[in-house]
Regions:
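Acidic catalytic patch
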Residues: 19, 43-48, 69-83
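Amphipathic alpha-helical segments within well-ordered protein domains
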Residues: 53-57, 72-75
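Short, well-structured N-terminal submotif of metal-dependent ribonuclease cores
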Residues: 1-44, 59-66
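Short, catalytically relevant binding-site loops at active-site mouths
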Residues: 12-13, 49-51
Length: 83
């Protein structure tokens, strides 16, 4: 059975926004290594998803539909799954 690890809100927001670019690339590389090499199943809890949804709107001025779409994209990418 693969090990499961949760990500926090800041990581989910970074994955959804791609900002800042240099950190985004580093985070994606590290998470990809965990999933593909170390066979870790990454997840975002429901609370983390809700916090990221609010943060995208409040701090990044992302509309509700765009925030939903960005989070859906991350959570269906195969890298991170909802819990």
């Amino acid at each position: 059975m693969p090990r499961r690890c949760g990500i926090d809100t800041s990581i989910l927001v970074r994955l959804a926004t791609g900002e800042p670019a240099q950190d985004f690339d580093r985070v994606v590389a590290a998470l990809t290594h965990l999933v593909e090499v170390e066979h870790v199943a990454l997840f975002a809890s429901h609370m983390v998803i809700v916090e990221a949804y609010v943060a995208l709107q409040h701090h990044y001025a992302v509309s509700k539909p765009d925030a939903k779409a960005a989070l859906r994209s991350v959570l269906t990418s195969g890298l991170v799954a909802p819990s």
